[in-house]
Regions:
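Generic start-of-chain signal for non-secretory N-termini
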Residues: 1-32
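Acyltransferase donor/substrate-recognition loop-hinge adjacent to the catalytic core
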Residues: 2-4, 141-222
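A conserved beta-strand-loop-helix scaffold within acyl/acetyltransferase catalytic domains
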Residues: 22-55, 63-73, 200-303
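An acidic- and aromatic-residue-enriched active-site/binding cleft used to recognize and process polar
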Residues: 55, 66-70, 85-87, 118-120, ...
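Acyl-donor binding region in acyl/amide transferases
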Residues: 74-155, 160, 274-352
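Short beta-strand-to-coil "C-cap" segments at the C-terminal boundary of structured domains/repeats
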Residues: 167-170, 365-369
Length: 369
């Protein structure tokens, strides 16, 4: 395939093609989980999106490009980021898409490309390079195995890798967690607190949780602090939907939040059934999975410990609280979100659960010439 036309996404047809393309590519793939259409539409207002067509007018590729100015200032770089990249198994299509990103980035004064990355660290990041036979989730990117091969053929190299682990939920809390949790409770005066929706949305706990996340994640690769308006949106759209039994915070004696663990029952099969559409009936699948008949896996969405308290049993306190709840609700497996491969301190917290690395994803980079 040679005659590839890349357009900036502007018309209603182009928007719809951008949304529907991955569903067509992965129509017969049982591991792919779609994004919600409404989330994609909203995101298109914040990025420069491109759609690729073949010589008969069929959509064959897509990508979004954007510049995170705060990240560039923080990390001392001039990078254009890309995300939401999908394409058929054709080198010319991949090249046309990335040429468009590189050209647009150059026009904006950037000197390198990085991605797939989100606008914030809580967005989906990293191209899958291992684990193509594992079910995806609401918090991660899925792509076919030919993606990294074609991207690397274009001269892109590894900037960072994230790994994801899966653990079988034990019937009883591991002794290591119990022992360390006891120390945190009795010596440091730390305590578990469960929240109501009102406390999260109206009582300020939502903002306090994201303040902790911003503080704990600040040193991590590519991270930029989430602004207040985005915190408000995430709190209202997502955190309020979480079963509050699956959300734990740890407070010190001054009632300051020093740790948080936001988890949620997997929505993967519900999203597959809905095909990413809330209407007319897609919302029934999602609400049903959240409220009534959940899947057997719990997603560990966001885990953070205040830097001053890291290594003092905060994580153990959270798991001591959550493991019995997971068992009570019938969950069998826990799957962590992407974690940087060199973040050994964070990865070591799973050791008592005999973790298995099941996925690896990569951020690529390339200089713009």
């Amino acid at each position: 395939m040679r005659n590839i036309r890349v357009e900036k996404v502007q018309s209603r047809t182009e928007v719809n093609d951008f949304i529907e393309l991955p569903k067509r590519i992965y129509a017969d793939n049982k591991y792919y989980v779609p994004d919600l259409d409404l989330d994609i539409r909203e995101n298109l207002t914040k990025v420069q999106a491109f759609i690729a067509y073949n010589d008969v007018g069929d959509a064959v590729g897509r990508v979004a490009a954007f510049i995170n100015q705060k990240a560039n200032v923080k990390w001392g770089q001039k990078a254009v980021r890309f995300s939401q990249i999908d394409f058929i198994n054709d080198f010319d299509v991949a090249k046309a898409l990335m040429d468009a990103v590189e050209e647009w980035g150059h026009e904006q004064g950037m000197d390198k490309v990085m991605g797939p990355m989100g606008q914030y660290d809580f967005d989906k990041e990293g191209m899958l390079v291992e684990g193509f036979d594992q079910l995806s989730s609401i918090i991660e990117i899925y792509n076919a195995s030919y993606y990294p091969a074609l991207i690397e053929k274009l001269g892109y190299t590894k900037a960072a890798d994230w790994v994801q682990t899966r653990m079988e939920i034990p019937k009883v809390v591991p002794k290591m967690y119990s022992r360390v949790a006891k120390y945190a409770r009795e010596t440091l005066g730390l305590k578990v607190k469960k929240l109501t929706t009102r406390e999260i949305t109206k009582g300020g706990y939502g903002k306090r949780i994201f303040h902790l996340l911003n503080e704990a994640y600040s040193p991590l690769f590519g991270f930029t602090e989430m602004p207040p308006q985005q915190v408000e949106q995430y709190t209202n759209q997502y955190v309020r939907l979480v079963d509050k039994r699956l959300l734990t915070i740890i407070e010190n004696e001054k009632e300051e939040i020093v740790g948080t663990c936001v988890t949620m029952g997997s929505l993967s099969q519900a999203l597959r059934k809905s095909r990413g559409r809330l209407f007319p009936f897609g919302w029934l699948h999602l609400i049903g999975s959240l409220k009534w008949k959940h899947e057997d896996t719990v997603q560990l969405l966001l885990i953070a410990v205040k830097p001053d308290y890291q290594g003092y049993g905060v994580s153990a306190l959270m798991f001591e609280d959550l493991i019995p709840i997971y068992n009570e609700l019938g969950f069998k497996w826990a799957e962590a979100g992407p974690q940087l491969e060199y973040n050994h301190k964070e990865l070591s917290q799973w050791r008592p659960l005999n973790p298995e690395i099941i996925k690896r994803r990569r951020c690529y980079t390339k200089a713009i010439k």
